[in-house]
């Protein structure tokens, strides 16, 4: 029986787990927290698909074209085609396992418009689609747990891959309760560790997603891809702790963006520039337009009747009332762009295998399907679909040889123990917050050469000092040992952004304002002993 180690228990990790278990493989599903606390539960808007009986005259080909166009043609057509062709079956599967979709007046799954799409094709569960899918998949995981095919390991954090000569044989995980490292050997390891929110501090996402796994595997030889493409969601609301996402569903239901001019009159700037559908341009376009107004921007949905708002946007109503005392049935929502999604991550082939054999990546930590900008509604689809693709690929592989890494485990445990006996030079939180400030200031919606160089120099200072920074014993050891990997990833993101001398999708350069034909390829970056090597994937080495 094949053994599969999946690290991360959000939607992509659970999708891969139930698909592997369904094919008779034994799965260890490891994560720091239960699935109910994964970032996946925060996904509000919906999941894209073209169903056979749709009344929109929509087609799978239209979904493919919209996805490729929305990604500024950097996503691979073959992988996107597989994603879109499989979407209808995924909606049916999710219904079958208990996902409670909102229904239209004919009792069928309801769908609405989302940005950058030529037809209404985003199916939803109110404004809590992620929660519903997590709940349904969680029940499937429990079913396979009862059958002995899935074993959950909670309180486990990724430490490093067990990699030799470009092949992965397992991973070392850190136990939060034991403060010990443990080696897990497997025929395949699947990373489902999410995006890079900690790099930027206040984002719409969870700080569980810190990018460390990608940074550490990058240091261990994995190729990363498209790191410069960072999606700023155009409609987020400021709160004390973070930026709260105001779902694209609000604009899908007719929400209008505006600012006030000198006469205190509303200017519907998106409609003025792009016509009636202006509010539903792609996220990169809307964020850039908000940035260029230089004004306070508002999103208004108050013209809809209260019954419709309560039925279709209940979570948005409750969110605004709870955190800002705003009644969206009566007044507009103050919004601004904020870091939301990372199109870049571990480079994977169409079967989700990384540059390291037997190491796979799914969900937001994998760079596939979205190109230079993700369409709303495609991330949940990619999470469910990608987990299945990886499971299929793993099932076709022969069981690999076993190599033990006992000396490596012992050495890493000794390093951890010795570090715990030191006294902190700087508080972990101080360094983390400073890194986030550097990234926010130098990797905004619009970037320029000087700011990118400044950011690289500041991150380099911390990287060079990493060996002298002692552990902060006021936090979990995980936060201490993960810091160097996060710093290396931050430097790689800045390096890729400086390398791409054009404006495409979510990447905008002040000095290079147009799309350049010479950059019509994904960015690949490798790491070797402190050296960062960037190139364009002109040969279609990954995602075709």
Question: Language-model segments: which ranges?
Answer:
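Glycine- and aromatic-enriched mobile tails/lids
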Residues: 2-3, 34-36, 42-43, 47, ...
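N-terminal Rossmann-like FAD-binding beta1-loop-alpha1 element of flavoenzymes
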Residues: 4-29
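Conserved N-terminal glycine-rich FAD pyrophosphate-binding loop of Rossmann-like flavoproteins
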Residues: 33-66
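Helix-loop-beta segment of a Rossmann-like dinucleotide-binding subdomain
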Residues: 73-77, 108-134, 197-201, 297-307
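Short beta-strand to alpha-helix junction loop
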Residues: 75-85, 123-139, 203-211, 236-240, ...
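Conserved redox-cofactor binding core of oxidoreductases
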Residues: 95-180, 185, 192, 233-240
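Glycine-rich loop(s) and the adjacent beta-strand/alpha-helix scaffold that form part
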Residues: 188-243, 377-393
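An anion/pyrophosphate-binding glycine-rich loop and adjacent beta-alpha core
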Residues: 216, 222-329, 393-399
């Amino acid at each position: 029986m094949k053994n599969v180690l999946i690290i991360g228990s959000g939607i992509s990790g659970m999708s891969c787990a139930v698909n592997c278990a369904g094919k008779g493989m034994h799965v260890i599903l490891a994560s720091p927290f239960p699935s109910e606390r994964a970032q996946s539960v925060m996904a509000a808007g919906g999941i894209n698909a073209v169903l056979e009986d749709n009344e929109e005259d929509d087609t799978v080909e239209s979904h493919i074209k919209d996805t490729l166009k929305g990604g500024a043609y950097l996503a691979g057509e073959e992988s996107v085609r597989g994603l879109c062709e499989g979407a209808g079956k995924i909606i049916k599967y999710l219904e079958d396992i208990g996902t409670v979709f909102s229904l239209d007046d004919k009792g069928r799954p309801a769908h609405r418009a989302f940005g950058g799409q030529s037809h209404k094709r985003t199916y939803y569960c109110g404004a809590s689609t992620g929660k519903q899918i997590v709940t349904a998949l969680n029940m499937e995981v429990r079913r396979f747990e009862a059958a002995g095919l899935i074993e959950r390991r909670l309180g486990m954090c990724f430490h490093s891959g067990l990699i030799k000569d470009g092949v992965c044989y397992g991973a070392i995980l850190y136990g939060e309760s034991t403060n010990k490292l443990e080696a897990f050997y497997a025929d395949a390891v699947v990373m489902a560790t999410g995006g890079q929110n900690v790099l930027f501090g206040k984002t719409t996402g969870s700080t569980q997603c810190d990018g460390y796994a990608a940074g550490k595997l990058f240091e261990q030889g994995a190729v990363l891809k498209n790191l410069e493409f960072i999606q700023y969601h155009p409609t987020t609301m400021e709160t004390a702790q973070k930026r709260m996402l105001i779902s694209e569903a609000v604009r899908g239901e007719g929400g209008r963006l505006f600012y006030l001019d000198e006469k205190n009159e509303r200017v519907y700037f998106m409609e003025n520039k792009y016509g009636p559908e202006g509010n539903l341009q792609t996220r990169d376009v809307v964020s850039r337009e908000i940035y260029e107004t230089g004004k306070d921007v508002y999103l208004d949905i108050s013209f809809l009747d209260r019954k419709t708002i309560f039925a279709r946007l209940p979570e948005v109503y409750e969110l605004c009332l709870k955190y800002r005392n705003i009644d969206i049935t009566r007044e507009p929502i103050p919004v601004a762009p904020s870091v939301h999604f990372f199109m870049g991550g571990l480079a994977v082939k169409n079967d989700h295998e990384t540059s390291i054999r037997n190491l796979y990546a799914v969900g937001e930590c994998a760079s596939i399907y979205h190109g230079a900008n993700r369409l709303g509604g495609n991330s949940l689809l990619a999470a469910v679909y990608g987990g299945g693709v990886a499971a299929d690929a793993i099932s076709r592989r022969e069981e690999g040889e076993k190599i033990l890494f006992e000396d490596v485990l012992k050495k890493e445990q000794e390093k951890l123990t010795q570090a715990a006996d030191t006294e902190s030079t700087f508080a972990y939180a101080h360094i983390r917050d400073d890194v986030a400030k550097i990234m926010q200031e130098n990797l905004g919606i619009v970037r320029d050469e000087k700011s990118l160089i400044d950011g690289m120099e500041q991150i380099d200072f911390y990287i060079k000092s990493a060996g002298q920074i002692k552990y902060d014993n006021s936090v979990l050891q995980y936060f201490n040992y993960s810091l160097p990997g996060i710093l290396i990833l931050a430097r790689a993101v800045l390096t890729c952004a400086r390398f791409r001398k054009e404006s495409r999708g979510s990447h905008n350069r002040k000095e290079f304002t147009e799309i350049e034909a010479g950059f019509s390829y994904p960015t690949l970056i490798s790491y070797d002993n402190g050296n960062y090597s960037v190139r364009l994937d002109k040969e279609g080495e990954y995602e075709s």
